């Protein structure tokens, strides 16, 4: 099945879970976010295969990998080898045993805050890359397309004035789209994907609500935060145009 005719959010791919377009949300000035500009998803597993043609239809021209250095070494992104794609890798959270131990002892939203406070330089690089991206869609991904990807998606939607409830709803959709993979992994004996044993696999609305509240109360707004870490007003305006115009 190919990408939508231009006005559907979910993108069905053979080798990628949790893939969707950020288009279709009401935003500032009575406008709506545009389809085919920003795609969020998890990492592709295996070779690109038929997904290559589907992504070319959109067309995806820029990919930003948000995973940790260890993750990308163990499982390199298939997008990095695509000749027609500009590939960037900027770590927002390093997933390792120390991180897992830390995140298990605190609410998930607090680990999201670490991406703002402990990875400022990389966060700035993500938005520099988005602003400078050539014409075509920007696809950004982590491992599951839920946490680090969810952070960037929330910030993009916030930049153009999408309502908080819609931002939270966009985050929650991962619960549904990841279920088939989680069930398969648990059936194969991988209990790490059991949501009852690992509640951080869930995309609870409270997690994104608290993250957005922290961002606004601490920095004033997403735009103010990004400006504070070195993303220029001109770059932010360019990003807004990409998503709205």
Question: What are the residue ranges of the model-derived segments?
Answer:
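Cys-dependent protein tyrosine phosphatase-like superfamily
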Residues: 1-139, 152-245
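Ser/Thr-glycine-rich phosphate-binding loops at phosphate-binding pockets of nucleotides
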Residues: 144, 148-149
């Amino acid at each position: 099945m190919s990408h939508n005719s231009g006005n559907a959010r979910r993108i069905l791919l053979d080798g990628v879970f949790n893939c969707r377009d950020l288009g279709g949300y009401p935003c500032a000035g009575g406008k709506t976010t545009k389809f085919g500009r920003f795609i969020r998803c998890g990492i592709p597993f295996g070779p690109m295969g038929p997904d290559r043609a589907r992504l070319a239809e959109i067309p995806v021209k820029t990919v930003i990998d948000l995973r940790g250095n260890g993750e990308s070494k163990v499982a390199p992104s298939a997008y990095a080898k695509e000749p027609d794609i500009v590939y960037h890798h900027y770590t927002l959270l390093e997933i390792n045993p120390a991180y897992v131990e830390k995140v298990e002892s605190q609410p998930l939203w607090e680990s999201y805050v670490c991406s703002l406070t402990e990875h400022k330089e990389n966060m700035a690089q993500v938005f520099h890359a988005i602003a400078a991206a050539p014409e075509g869609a920007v696809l950004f991904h982590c491992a599951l397309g839920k946490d680090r990807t969810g952070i960037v998606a929330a910030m993009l939607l916030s930049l153009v004035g999408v309502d908080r409830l819609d931002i939270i709803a966009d985050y929650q959709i991962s619960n549904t789209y990841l279920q088939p993979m989680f069930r398969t992994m648990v059936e194969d004996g991988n209990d790490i994907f059991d949501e009852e044993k690992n509640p951080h696999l869930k995309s609870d609305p409270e997690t994104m609500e608290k993250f957005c509240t922290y961002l606004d109360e601490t920095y004033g707004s997403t735009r103010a935060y990004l400006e504070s870490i070195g993303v220029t007003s001109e770059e932010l305006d360019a990003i807004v145009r990409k998503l709205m115009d």
